[in-house]
Structure formats: structure tokens, C-alpha cells
Amino acid sequence: MAPQIKRIGVLTGGGDCPGLNAVIRGVVKSASNLYQWEIIGIEDGFEGLINGMTRPLTQSDIKGILTLGGTILGTTNRGNPFDFVDRDGVKKDLSSVVIENIKRLSLDGLVVIGGDGSLAIANQLYKMGAPVVGVPKTIDNDLSATDVTFGFDTAVNTARDALDKLQSTAESHHRVLVLEVMGRYAGWIALHAGIAGGADVILIPEIPFDRGKVCDKVRRRFQGKTGFAIVVVAEGAKPFGGEIVTQAPAEKGRLERLGGIGNRVGNDISMCMGGDIDVRVTVLGHIQRGGTPSARSEERRVGKECRSRWSPYH
């Protein structure tokens, strides 16, 4: 028989996305109203479990956060307890510290709201005996255990809205407009937004692209009566035989920072068109992570469902 649950912890890890606060709200409302559990908020992801940065979460803490972007608990891409990098750049395994802090806080359960990296850490902690429930969040939609992650739909809507605006200016000025979107090594945002926004070319990480074919497609748009073109490229896309473009390498516990492929594609198109066509590049960037979650998102229900997924210490 599972032990009686009295206190749970909740943290948000990795990159932020729309809907994090809605999940936190769902967890707190369900746990406190239905089961009278005490909820402990862990600040700045797993770093909070390592450094003991926690605070109680009550009904007053979640007022007005349903549609609020970001996360009231803070988050970080650093702080992997299994590969923690200290200020001197020394890597340490602090997973035992996390397990001890979970026990010290008397947590009967831990809700980890995160993407592939955070949930991989959560799975490792579960194997060490921690009572963990993972909530799949990421704008990248790259988690295999669920069809759609929360945050993805809102990011797609943001990218599609940008395409709507770019299309009118591209047509007015007879330009090629290249839009670089996020997604890391997955092309879901580029694909869905590109289709919805009527892009002429969509480049995704899963399919290396041929520079010549991209240029041919753009050239045909200008040979006809259209006179403009829209290209959507995911940040992790790369040409045949090429490498993913990065802005910064992986170091000090951080993942490599992707970005720059949009400008590469724009330069390629400009060169193959002989410089006769005006090519402009827009990098959508972190605007895809912010703002109010879309109406289609199901963060509140996900937050409330956490309570039925507990596993006891094993």
C-alpha cells in the first residue's frame, strides 16, 4: 500500500514556455482543495533542490497566474544534479544531495514540469527511488511519450502570426523573407507554422536540405506573377553535408545555443539570385516562449491530473 501523501514539491526546469503557471496553478488547486496536501515550490529548477531554494505555495500565490507567461518559480537550463558544474568549472554528481533534500523536505511526491532534459533527470531520480511525476512541457514538441506538449500550440500560433505579417510586406516589396524559428533539433514549429502560414519553403532538422533546390523554388516564385517568397527554417536545420549552426558551444552545464541558420539560408538565396532580389531575414527568437497560452492548450487539466500519477518510494 502506498504511503499517505501529505506534502509535495513542484519545480519548472529548462526553457520557459506559455502555460507553466497554469500547470502550477492546477497542481496547487487540486492538491490543496481536494486532498489538503501541502505544496512546496522549488525555485529555479533542479538548482533549487540542490541549494535548498524553496517556499510554500498557497492559494494566494496562484491568484491571477492562469494566463500569466513565464513561471512564478523561475527556471534554468543549468543545474543537472548528475552533471553539475560549479563556479570553478568542476563537474560533480550531486544527485545524492537532491535525494537527501527531497527527504529532508519530507516530500511525498515531486512534480517536475520540464522538457526532454528535465524529464530525463526526473527519470534518473525516479530510478534512485524518488517519487516523481513528470509533466511534458516544451515548445519544441519533441517528447515521444505524448502527441503534443503544452507550450507547442502557442509557439506555433506566434510563428504563424509572424508569417501572416511577413507575407504582406514580402508581397508589397517583392522580397524573399526568411523566418527562423525555434525547435532545437525538431522541426515541428517550422512545419506546423509554415503550413498554416502558407510558406513556400519549409526547412526542418529531420530532412537535410539541398541549397540548389531551395534556390530553384524561390526562383520559380519570381519567374511567375507572384514576385515574392516566404521561407521558414527551423534553428536546427542544416544543408546536405553541412553542420548545425550554433551561436555558443555546450559548456558549464549549458546546452549548445542554436541559431544563425536563417542568415545562412538568406545569404545562399541572395547569391544564387545574383543579388537582384532583396532578401531579408527575421529571427523570431524568444517571443515564441512568452505570453498567454492558447485556448487549445490543456495546462490546467494536466496540472490537476498529476495527483493520480504518484508512485511511492521504491
Regions found by a protein language model. Give the residues of each.
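A cross-family phosphate/adenosyl-ligand binding-site feature
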Residues: 1-13, 23-108, 113, 117, ...
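Accessory alpha-helical/coil subdomains and C-terminal extensions
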Residues: 101, 112-114, 120-124, 131, ...
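Short beta-alpha connecting loops at secondary-structure transitions
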Residues: 141-143, 147, 249-253, 292-294
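Positively charged, low-complexity/disordered segments
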Residues: 299, 303-314
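Mobile late-domain/C-terminal helix-loop "cap" segments
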Residues: 284, 289-301
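Short, ordered loop/turn segments at secondary-structure junctions
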Residues: 13-16, 42-47, 77-78, 115-118, ...
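Small/polar-residue-rich loop-to-helix segments that shape phosphate-bearing ligand pockets
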Residues: 49-110, 116-197
